[in-house]
Amino acid sequence: MVLIRVLANLLILQLSYAQKSSELVIGGDECNINEHRSLVVLFNSSGFLCAGTLVQDEWVLTAANCDSKNFQMQLGVHSKKVLNEDEQTRDPKEEASLCPNRKKDDEVDKDIMLIKLDSRVSNSEHIAPLSLPSSPPSVGSVCRIMGWGTISPTKETYPDVPHCANINILDHAVCRAAYPWQPVSSTTLCAGILQGGKDTCWGDSGGPLICNGEFQGIVSWGAHPCGQPHNPGVYTKVSDYTEWIKSIIAGNTAAACPP
């Protein structure tokens, strides 16, 4: 079964594919407190929704499948139990930007959403934006995944701190073979460990895939159970959307996404 890795109102939506929003990293370890300065928590009155990534001091990038009403964003978070002094909370300033040509009936089509914050974020010890990519990663690249998603491949076991793991960029043919019933778009990245054991999962949706210090992917969807051999994750390819992102930030709200 393919899982869209999203938790909405604390429920897992069981679909023919699975979004990874609100997922944890499988097979990882606790992230270093200073290695996830761009990681953002999206939450509402029901609890945690998704992750996101700070890309400029007033802009957060996440997955479109994380779109929800009345959510807020928290930055600078490491432990759910111990507050960092520099944590900051923001509301969306306006309606989030989605691709205008996104298929409304396909939750993983053009799975990207850009959110403007109601006020700028100040860089600090635990908060800083992540660079957009200058080019896509090559097959074989080692990339970092991170999030508060479940650390169990089959049940919801959520950690108090984000977990991180290293995975590899794989050829698209691997994901197409793994998910023949779900189109794997060329505007996505296929990433994981062929032998399994490391993966994003429930609760990680919207979070970053970081390769060589650049924000290359957004956690979108994958298999359930998570972390199985030959069942890698599918990530929105950020490099294909950089012009759209820059256009929206510049004020062109009618900018088109790639086909």
Swiss-Prot record:
Query: Which cystines does this chain contain?
Result: 31-164, 50-66, 99-257, 143-211, 175-190, 201-226
Q: Give the record's glycosylation annotations as residue positions.
A: 44
Record-level Gene Ontology MF annotations:
serine-type endopeptidase activity; toxin activity
Q: Where is the active site?
A: 111, 205
The listed locations are: Secreted
User: Which residue range or ranges hold the Peptidase S1 domain?
Assistant: 25-250
Q: How is its activity regulated?
A: Inhibited by PMSF.
Q: Which positions are cleaved off as the propeptide during maturation?
A: 19-24
User: PROSITE patterns given for it?
Assistant: TRYPSIN_DOM, TRYPSIN_SER
* Keywords for this protein: Blood coagulation cascade activating toxin, Disulfide bond, Glycoprotein, Hemostasis impairing toxin, Hydrolase, Protease, Secreted, Serine protease, Sialic acid, Signal, Toxin, Zymogen
| GO annotation, cellular component aspect | extracellular region; secretory granule
The post-translation modification note in this UniProt entry reads: The different mass observed by mass spectrometry may represent 3 different glycoforms that bear a single non- (27066), mono- (27357), and di-sialylated (27649), fucosylated complex-type dianntenary glycan chain.
**Residues annotated as signal peptide:** 1-18
Protein EC: 3.4.21.-
Q: Where is this region: Disordered?
A: 82-102
The tissues where this chain's protein is expressed are given as: Expressed by the venom gland.
Q: What does this protein do?
A: Snake venom serine protease that clots human plasma and bovine fibrinogen. Upon intravenous injection in mice, this protease renders blood unclottable (defibri(ogen)ation). Intravenous administration (10 and 5 ug) induces a gyroxin-like effect: loss of the righting reflex, opisthotonus, and intermittent rotations over the long axis of the body. These effects persisted during approximately 10 minutes, after which the animals apparently recovers.
Concerning PANTHER family, the annotation shows: KALLIKREIN-1 (PTHR24271:SF47), KALLIKREIN-RELATED (PTHR24271)
| Subunit note | Monomer.
Q: What is this protein called?
A: Thrombin-like enzyme asperase
Q: Which organism is it from?
A: Bothrops asper
Upper lineage is: Eukaryota, Metazoa, Chordata, Craniata, Vertebrata
